[in-house]
Amino acid sequence: MDRLRIHGKTDWNMPFLPCTPWLCCAFLLIASTALKAADPKETTSPPSTPTIPSAATAAKGDPAASPWPGDRVDQWHGFVRHRFAVDGATAWVVEPHQAAPGKPWSWCLEFPDAFTDRTGVLQLLEHGFHHVHLEVGNTFGSPRALEQFEAFYQVLQRGGLGPKAALVGISRGGLYAYRWAAKNPERVACIYGDAPVCDFKSWPGGKGTGKGSAGDWTQLQRYYGFATEAEALAFSGNPVDRLAPLAKAKVRLIHVVGDTDDVVPVTENTRLIESRYQALGGQIQVIHKPGVGHHPHGLDDPAPVVTFIRESFRDGKP
């Protein structure tokens, strides 16, 4: 009897059957099938279905679950907050439990953690608004800050938020909100100014009846690149000077002010905005708080502000 040679050695215990034509064909067929199964280039599988991450997954910090770059996740007043970097600044986006149709959003440009129970931002989140902020610091709506805001807006658009924002300008945040809005009126549904600075000659300049702030005035001139104080005083890009683009775009305005505010006097800021905007045909509502100064910001019941902002996104509006 013939013996089978395995790996060059003769196995005297294993019989070797003579190779008939039909047996050779069967062997080759089996070998070919085995090779194909072992070759990944020859295997096919159904295309995978992309998984859409849930909010719960995002809350665990899964970076694949978020549209935001370099996302870090935490909580903000019981809502999921995404933190990431944009143009050298820390940005964050708070998402509602259930986004409203069109993904409307509010943007607090400065002091985003101040008086949140009085400014309506938490109620807007409950109504399905996203809420965002970019930390540019005490830069007074300077040209560099506006560049960073532009980069942030582009990220928000790539992330799927609606095309227009409800801007929230608290105190000096009024400079940030109005100056960005004047450059981008088509991206703004409304502005909520709360004791807002609308002319930096008033604050921090202190050139009117208000207290002013010498240190902030010096810092503002540096951020804006003014060579002299006279150049700052001649500047024509304050919110009170740049209302025409907003009126043309029909941006709605609402202000909340304390009538005894001696830091950001109403007569030098909100009253100028009100009279000039109305003269341009714009819509503005001012809520006065008799006997109240610069603080506290907001309202005991912010429902009027919440209603105003929500109405700005209804009836074919953004």
Language-model segments: what does each one mean?
Residues 115-132:
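Short amphipathic alpha-helix adjacent to the substrate-entry channel of hydrolases
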Residues 140-160, 179:
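Alpha/beta-hydrolase active-site loop
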Residues 263, 267-318:
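C-terminal catalytic histidine-bearing segment of alpha/beta-hydrolase fold enzymes
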Residues 41-101, 215-221, 317:
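A domain-start/cap signature at the N-terminus of enzymes
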Residues 210-278:
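The feature captures the conserved acid-bearing segment of alpha/beta-hydrolase catalytic domains
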Residues 160-171:
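Alpha/beta-hydrolase fold nucleophile elbow
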Residues 179-230:
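Hydrolase active-site cap/lid region
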Residues 101-111:
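Short beta-strand element of the alpha/beta-hydrolase
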